[in-house]
Regions:
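C-terminal domain-closing interface element
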Residues: 9-16, 150-179
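Active-site-adjacent bridging/hinge elements
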Residues: 83-96
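Cytochrome P450 heme-binding "Cys pocket" and the immediately downstream C-terminal segment
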Residues: 90, 107-161
Length: 179
């Protein structure tokens, strides 16, 4: 199961459920970094101002995830990632479920539920590519307020007439039985 854990982490890294997030400052504060030309100077945020952060872009930072940060490579979670070299990036460099006191309360449940679903599908059905795909299956990238693929990638069991499984980040997993 360690590899499944790595696969799920990598999927959530590349396609976070909420790719862009915003917060409103309730009081004037100074952030320790984000100012100046190189982003290393303090930055003042006034009361009432909105601060947006892009998890989608952060999860593709080469300084945290290596030179292949834009590629799907689950094995990266088994390595000594740059992400874990200091406490701040280890805590705030991977945010598919947000972080701090506003982190998703259901993240552990969601992770276990996703792992269970993937395992049960793989145990029960041999998955093959549909005839329409000749090479690698490439999904269409989509970025909005919620990460989803408008067109699901269709995967079919060997006995196509009995079952079709459509995987789509936007709609969850739909299973259609029958012909």
């Amino acid at each position: 199961m360690p590899y499944l854990d790595q696969v799920l982490r990598e999927v959530l890294r590349l396609y976070p459920p909420v790719p862009v997030n915003t917060r409103t400052a309730h009081k004037t504060t100074i952030l320790p970094t984000g100012g100046g030309k190189d982003g290393t100077k303090p930055f003042m945020v006034r009361e009432g101002e909105n601060v947006a952060f892009c998890v989608y872009a952060m999860h593709r930072r080469e300084d945290l995830y290596g030179p292949d940060a834009g590629q799907f490579r689950p094995e990266r979670w088994d390595e000594d990632l740059l992400l874990f070299q200091n406490e701040r990036t280890a805590t705030w460099g991977y945010l598919p479920f947000n972080g701090g006191p506003r982190a998703c309360l259901g993240q552990d449940f969601g992770f276990v539920e996703a792992a269970y679903t993937v395992v049960r599908i793989l145990q029960k059905y041999p998955i093959v590519k549909p005839d329409m795909y000749k090479g690698d299956i490439q999904g269409r990238k989509w970025l909005g307020w919620s990460s989803h693929q408008p067109e699901g990638i269709e995967m079919v069991t060997e006995e196509r007439q009995k079952m079709t499984i459509v995987l789509s980040l936007g709609d969850g997993c739909r299973v259609t039985l029958g012909r």
